[in-house]
A protein has these predicted regions:
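Small-residue-rich beta-alpha loop regions that form the catalytic core of phosphotransfer
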Residues: 36-83
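ATP/NTP phosphate-donor binding region
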Residues: 1-46, 50, 58
């Protein structure tokens, strides 16, 4: 299974979390790919989106076009969609 990871890497803490998540997934034997923008989502079975509701919403259309499932992890303020 190929897993993509998408999150805002403009913050140092976010980059650290993304790096740790990718390392963990690879240690379990998953092929991983990091994305920096929703438009890049393709070539994976699932994308893990770290962010708030806006990140999930922006990722929905590109993911759907490429038949990619979304797993959301709330890293924002509201988190309604990741609840």
């Amino acid at each position: 299974m190929k897993i993509g990871v998408l999150g805002k890497i403009t913050k140092v803490k976010s980059q650290q979390v993304i790096d740790e998540l990718v390392e963990f997934l690879r240690s379990l034997g998953y092929e991983t790919q990091m994305f920096t923008a929703p438009q890049e989502i393709q070539g994976v079975d699932v994308v893990i989106v770290l962010g708030g509701d806006g990140a999930i919403l922006h990722s929905a259309v590109p993911a759907a076009r490429n038949n990619v499932k979304i797993i959301g992890i709330n890293y924002g303020n509201l988190g309604f969609l990741t609840e």
